Amino acid sequence: MNPRRKKRLTLAVALIVGVAGAASLLLYALNSNLNLFYTPNEIINGKNDTGIKPEIGQRIRIGGMVTMGSMVRDPDSLHVEFAVHDSTGTQVIVTYDDLLPDLFREGQGIVAQGVLTDSGKLEATEVLAKHDENYMPPEVAEAMGKQHKKLEYQEGVEKTAQY
């Protein structure tokens, strides 16, 4: 191999390695900032298609209906704790330390974003409530079997997060 070809080959290999390294760093940065959407059932049992569960400490979004009678407020602070359930009746406890949206109430659809703790609770940093009686966030509607109607709470059909 003559020196000119060797120099070109070295340059091409270095360029390919550099592009691959930059692409892997970009994908790593994007992956750490992803907020994956889960229903309570998917948090407990894993995604339907892959069976993958969210990891402890992972930043996720959860969508579902606020369980009737589950909201507990701390009288001395803004801390509130409530359960979110889906169409299967599976529940996950959500804790939040800020003002809840005006439209937030039990029996309504919400999307909460936060970090999953080792106790199976979601420490929410943001809670979004649906806008009116007929609206349901698209992610929640799709995850709950494309039912664009309010789920009825059934007593006795409760599952809580256990880790």
Swiss-Prot record:
Pfam families: CcmE (PF03100). The chain crosses the membrane at residues 9-29. GO terms for biological process: cytochrome complex assembly. Residues 30-163 are periplasmic. Heme binds at H131, Y135. It is a single-pass type II membrane protein. InterPro entries: CcmE (IPR004329), CcmE-like_sf (IPR036127), NA-bd_OB-fold (IPR012340). GO terms for cellular component: plasma membrane. Heme chaperone required for the biogenesis of c-type cytochromes. Transiently binds heme delivered by CcmC and transfers the heme to apo-cytochromes in a process facilitated by CcmF and CcmH. This is Cytochrome c-type biogenesis protein CcmE. It comes from Shewanella denitrificans (strain OS217 / ATCC BAA-1090 / DSM 15013). The lineage of its organism: Bacteria, Pseudomonadati, Pseudomonadota, Gammaproteobacteria, Alteromonadales.
